[in-house]
């Protein structure tokens, strides 16, 4: 019998992460991510004035990656937002959740909405070849590309199409323990770095505390991920976000870079771009991961005119060489 609270309290043992094409069925403890919930009659109205997405148009069976910005249009965080129970929930990086929630709550005293962290739920990733078939043995209904959110018996299941089909499971400790018991010998286990690696490959921006309030949403490709509504009403930071679109003020984009490096850069580090015989500091690292084969993957915000021909390196790592990889979507204005 699996201890009910094992997955809830402890991350799975860390294994070197793999690219989606090499990944066997794997359950992933998402301890580096955290959940928050919002309930109450004013929740939609309140969220509508705080985030970049059109919350009133979010169907029960959809999730969306949107941004919560400051007055200058810089993102406190990005949020994976979805319907959950009687209200909404969102997932973000754990290391900035408390700071982001304090910003989100600033004006909530005037609204009938309750915003709270939720550490009772267990967040698990499920990815790798054949993972749908394995999950289908444990859940009677699974989300898919047409209906990316399913709520079932208190569990909320999210579907992601990229970089390959994967799922994010919001479970009770009991449901998590039951799933582990049922699938235990059929899946590998890994920690948050595997999910982070898949997010890098999918071009899904990862905002940690080091990069909070540093970037407008478009600098992290949020418009290309349909995370910004340009037709909804006012929200905090809207003027700057709209200006970036209509006046062409945004000159940056999010990139996936891959190659060799002696060190894995940290969130907030800069990179160096080769210009002839010289190197120039550029960009900001959002996240990075070293794979099982030794390759280093980096997600970074850089000038939006880079191409696959550009050569970059980790700062002050003369032997490193990383280049732009194709994302599974087109970067739009």
Swiss-Prot record:
Residue positions binding folate: 33, 195
Lineage top rank: taxon: Bacteria
Alphabetized Gene3D superfamilies for the sequence: 2.40.30.160, 3.30.70.1630, Aminomethyltransferase beta-barrel domains
One Gene Ontology MF term: folic acid binding
Keyword Cytoplasm found: yes
Cysteines engaged in disulfide bonds, as pairs: none
GO biological process, one term: tRNA processing
Family: Belongs to the tRNA-modifying YgfZ family.
Name recorded for this polypeptide: tRNA-modifying protein YgfZ
Species of the source: Pectobacterium carotovorum subsp. carotovorum (strain PC1)
């Amino acid at each position: 019998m699996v201890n009910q609270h094992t997955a809830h309290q402890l991350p799975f043992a860390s294994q070197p992460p793999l690219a989606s094409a090499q990944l066997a069925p794997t359950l992933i403890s998402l301890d580096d991510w955290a959940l928050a919930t919002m309930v109450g009659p004013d929740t939609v109205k309140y969220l509508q004035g705080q985030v970049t997405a059109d919350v009133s148009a979010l169907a029960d069976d959809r999730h969306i990656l949107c941004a919560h910005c400051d007055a200058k249009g810089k993102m406190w965080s990005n949020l994976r937002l979805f319907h959950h129970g009687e209200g909404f929930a969102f997932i973000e990086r754990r290391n900035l959740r408390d700071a982001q929630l304090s910003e989100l709550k600033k004006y909530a005293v005037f609204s009938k909405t309750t915003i709270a962290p939720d550490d009772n739920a267990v967040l698990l990733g499920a990815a790798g070849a054949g993972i749908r078939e394995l999950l289908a043995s444990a859940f009677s209904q699974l989300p898919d590309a047409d209906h990316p959110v399913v709520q079932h018996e208190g569990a909320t299941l999210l579907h992601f199409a990229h970089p390959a089909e994967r799922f994010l499971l919001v479970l009770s400790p009991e449901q998590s323990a039951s799933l582990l018991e049922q699938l235990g010998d059929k899946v590998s286990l890994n920690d948050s770095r595997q999910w982070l690696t898949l997010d890098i490959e999918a071009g899904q921006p990862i905002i940690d505390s080091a990069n909070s309030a540093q970037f407008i949403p478009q600098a992290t490709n949020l418009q290309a991920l349909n995370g910004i509504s340009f037709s909804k009403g006012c929200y905090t930071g809207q003027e700057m976000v709209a200006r970036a679109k209509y006046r062409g003020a945004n000159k940056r984009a999010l990139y996936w870079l891959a190659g060799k490096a002696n060190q894995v850069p940290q969130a907030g580090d800069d990179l160096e771009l080769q210009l002839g015989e010289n190197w120039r500091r550029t960009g900001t690292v959002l996240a990075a991961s070293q794979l099982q084969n030794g390759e280093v993957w980096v997600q970074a915000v850089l000038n939006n005119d880079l191409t696959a021909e550009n050569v970059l390196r980790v700062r002050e790592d003369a032997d490193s060489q990383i280049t732009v990889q194709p994302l599974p979507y087109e970067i739009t204005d």
